[in-house]
């Protein structure tokens, strides 16, 4: 869905130069066609299973409306994400409230909304039970299991190891289900696990699934009737151009194992997954403008997007492909390091990349920026957040406006005694 025309990067049928003339830079530009292709790939690979979009990856309402229209549920991690998921129109019977530190306010909101909960601790279980009794509801729950499985990814996004803050240790989950069965207001109907993000080796998924299914067999003996086994998300994407497993590959790895292990159960649970990055990651390009080219010990290209706009390279050392969006047909000439305008030396988007000759005013495209891009952006250094655009064929529209200087102080208040 990304191509070139007259040496200019195009998103579907639109040149990015046309977009930035109106929006300015930086700007996130998303392809609707690519988003829908990713959604259909999951639906085809897991046609009889439950698919919940991980709202954390990208919470833009327009994009979530498209995702919800394809029949997806939602994995939410906060009251704000639950609010956005409700506006987007996700199936209520497939909204799972995740998270390791839910406040009473968040739990009350989820119980009132009638969503399912992934319970992360016994304290949380007691709070859900208490609130459910207060409002006269029964809440369907799963426990999040920590399986102690290495997902072979960046340590900051590995969530299923024993030292992770998430989930109940797999050796202690039986006790949690025993407690849930004795409490009013909660009904255990599932089991949940999420081992990490940007996973490119499928074997940890299979390892985790087998640990979870061992637990499922055990808790059924307590009288728990499982309606779903949620293995979370985490499928990685091809940031570096070296290849990545597809939803079809993931299905081939885990569905036969899941179906085989279900023979050990008396119930017939559905497999649930929570894709996020692999739905939206490759759909979006960040367009940023060159403010300066500085030569010295290194050739630096200074652009108007830094880790205030895309924090992944600074936070995780992540690799994103870059190109000169207005010189797509030009031959690479020099090695550059692309840096942002933020007052820290870690503000680097791309290191040592061979690009065509870069000049002031050129546009740098940062690819695969659809997941954990805008949602992790900030107003650091007093920089208003950028716009987001959706392209559909030869049409495009702004789906999030660029912030103004006024937005920097919108929620601030000056006490009268300072005036």
UniProtKB/Swiss-Prot annotation:
Q: Which reaction does it catalyse?
A: meso-2,6-diaminopimelate + H(+) = L-lysine + CO2
Swiss-Prot/TrEMBL keywords: Amino-acid biosynthesis, Decarboxylase, Lyase, Lysine biosynthesis, Pyridoxal phosphate
Q: What does this protein do?
A: Specifically catalyzes the decarboxylation of meso-diaminopimelate (meso-DAP) to L-lysine.
Indicate which residues the UniProt annotation says bind substrate. Answer: 277, 312, 316, 344, 372
| Catalytic residues in the record | 343
Gene this protein is translated from? lysA
This one is known as Diaminopimelate decarboxylase
Recorded hits in PANTHER family, A to Z, give: DIAMINOPIMELATE DECARBOXYLASE (PTHR43727), GROUP IV DECARBOXYLASE (PTHR43727:SF2)
Q: What is its EC number?
A: 4.1.1.20
Molecular function terms in GO for this entry?
diaminopimelate decarboxylase activity; pyridoxal phosphate binding
Q: How does it assemble?
A: Homodimer.
Names of required cofactors? pyridoxal 5'-phosphate
Which annotated residues bind pyridoxal 5'-phosphate?
Answer: 234, 274-277, 372
**Residue numbers carrying N6-(pyridoxal phosphate)lysine:** 56
Got any disulfides in this one, which pairs?
none
Q: Which family is this protein grouped under?
A: Belongs to the Orn/Lys/Arg decarboxylase class-II family. LysA subfamily.
Q: Which Gene3D superfamilies match?
A: Alanine racemase, Lyase, Ornithine Decarboxylase, Chain A, domain 1
Which pathway or pathways does this protein act in? Answer: Amino-acid biosynthesis; L-lysine biosynthesis via DAP pathway; L-lysine from DL-2,6-diaminopimelate: step 1/1
Q: Name one GO biological process term.
A: lysine biosynthetic process via diaminopimelate
**Chain coiled-coil ranges:** none
PROSITE patterns xref list: ODR_DC_2_1, ODR_DC_2_2
Q: Which CDD domains match?
A: PLPDE_III_DapDC
């Amino acid at each position: 869905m990304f191509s070139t025309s007259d040496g200019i990067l195009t998103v579907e049928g639109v040149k990015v130069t046309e977009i930035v003339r109106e929006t300015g830079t930086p700007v996130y530009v998303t392809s609707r066609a690519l988003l829908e292709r990713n959604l259909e790939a999951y639906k085809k690979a897991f046609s009889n299973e439950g698919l919940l979009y991980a709202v954390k990856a990208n919470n833009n309402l327009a994009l979530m409306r498209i995702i919800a229209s394809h029949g997806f549920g939602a994995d939410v991690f906060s009251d704000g994400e639950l609010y956005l998921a409700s506006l987007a129109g996700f199936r209520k019977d497939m909204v799972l409230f995740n998270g390791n530190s839910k406040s009473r306010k968040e739990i009350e909101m989820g119980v009132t909304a009638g969503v399912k909960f992934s319970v992360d601790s016994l304290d949380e279980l007691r709070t859900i039970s208490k609130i459910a009794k207060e409002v006269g509801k029964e809440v369907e729950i799963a426990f999040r299991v920590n399986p102690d499985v290495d997902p072979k990814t960046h340590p900051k996004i590995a969530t299923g190891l024993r030292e992770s803050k998430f989930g109940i240790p797999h050796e202690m989950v039986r006790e949690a289900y025993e407690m849930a069965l004795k409490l009013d207001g909660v009904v255990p109907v599932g089991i949940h696990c999420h081992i990490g993000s940007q996973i490119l080796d499928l074997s940890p998924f299979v390892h985790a699934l087998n640990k979870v299914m061992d637990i499922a067999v055990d808790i059924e003996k307590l009288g728990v009737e499982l309606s779903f086994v949620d293995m979370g998300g985490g499928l990685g994407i091809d940031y570096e151009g070296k290849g990545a497993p597809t939803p079809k590959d993931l299905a081939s790895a885990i569905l036969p194992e899941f179906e085989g292990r279900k023979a050990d159960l008396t119930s017939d649970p559905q497999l649930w997954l929570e894709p996020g990055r692999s739905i939206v990651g490759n759909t979006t390009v960040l367009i940023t403008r060159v403010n300066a080219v500085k030569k010295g010990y290194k050739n630096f290209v200074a652009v108007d997007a830094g880790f205030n706009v895309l924090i992944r390279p600074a936070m995780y050392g992540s690799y994103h492909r870059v190109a000169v969006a207005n010189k797509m047909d030009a031959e690479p000439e020099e090695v550059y390091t692309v840096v942002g305008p933020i007052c820290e030396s870690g503000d680097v988007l791309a290191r040592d990349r061979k690009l065509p000759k870069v000049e002031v005013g050129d546009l740098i495209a940062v690819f695969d920026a659809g997941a954990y891009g805008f949602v992790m952006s900030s107003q650091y250094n007093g920089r208003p957040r950028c716009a987001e655009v959706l392209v559909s064929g030869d049409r495009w529209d702004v789906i999030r406006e660029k912030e103004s200087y006024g937005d920097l102080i919108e929620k601030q208040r000056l006490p009268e005694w300072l005036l």
